[in-house]
Amino acid sequence: MPGLKDGLKDNKKILLLSVGLLVASIVGLSFMKGSTINTNNLINTDTMQFTKPESVLEKGIDYKVVLKTSVGDITIDLFENETPDTVNSFLFLIGQRYYEGVTFHRVIKNFVIQTGDPTGTGSGGPGYTIDDEITSRKYKPYTLGMANAGPDTNGSQFFITSGNIPQSAMSNLDGNYTIFGEVVEGFAVVDSIERVTTDSNDKPANNVTVESIQILEN
């Protein structure tokens, strides 16, 4: 497992699912090494900002979303009953067209693909944070999770786990990052994004974008 395997061996590779301020000097970060995820504090950007998400989640409705990416569609079943605040925020931002045109700004083979930052830098957020909703559910391949900057700092950035993510990496995610959905269609699209060429910061050499997100209600 290139990259991740080396990091798991020598603890030198820091896997960042960044939803916070990323500057030349990363002073003040509390680093999590190996296959865990490190982020820092949210900052305001020139993108849309909100003080809190409006209440858009309706009881009794089963929600799915279709991520329409530049390389194909990914259908995700959301866990609205288990993580209502997270799903509500996600649906609110979708309704605001917040995610349209965002890139997958971090791709780590055999670990995760990450998106949800309109700035494309890993430093963007919606202007508010929501608390973690940790349940008994465990990470598995093709799981949808929230990136964070520590406990109760979820914003807009999210990730999908690799189809080949090792058990050790999943165990390190468990209990630290809210699980709020799982891929039900478009597994090959996730795989294709994971295989793109990236630079030393895990940023794809050629942009893969979320063109739009469709909400399906049942």
Where do the language-model regions lie?
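Cyclophilin-like peptidyl-prolyl cis-trans isomerases
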Residues: M1-N218
